[in-house]
């Protein structure tokens, strides 16, 4: 879909079929904010704007792919896994007491926090622009559309059969969208509740 949109706007110089090329061209043509609003699925990435000398960290809408970042001893570190940060010579892992408290209360450490001091996690649906003065601009490109009226019992006026058809259509469309890939696609079904639905 994004490739088609870019083609309609005149871009037709594709070198391959990768998602990475599509992401780069979309950002180059539309700018990062407009481009990521069109991205769906699970992703996190970091991109350097060589013209403006700006670094952007981006995380998918639901936060499925993590992305950690922070300044440690005059070095800016980022990674999709905390264990990779521990490999850097500048990083000495120190537990953040506030994050530990959140973990004990919630059994997880919610973004923007991480378990380590001076390391943050990009929030879902967020772009973080890293500035030269070591500050960050956070740009929310997507937020969960919560409509209170749609959550009330009286607002649902479909029959069971209509709801079944709607759900089947939604699941079919979502699965079809996820099947588009530049590599072979497979699925592992465990037999659990989520695989059986």
What are these regions (language model features)?
Residues 1-197:
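Cysteine-centered catalytic environments shared across enzyme families
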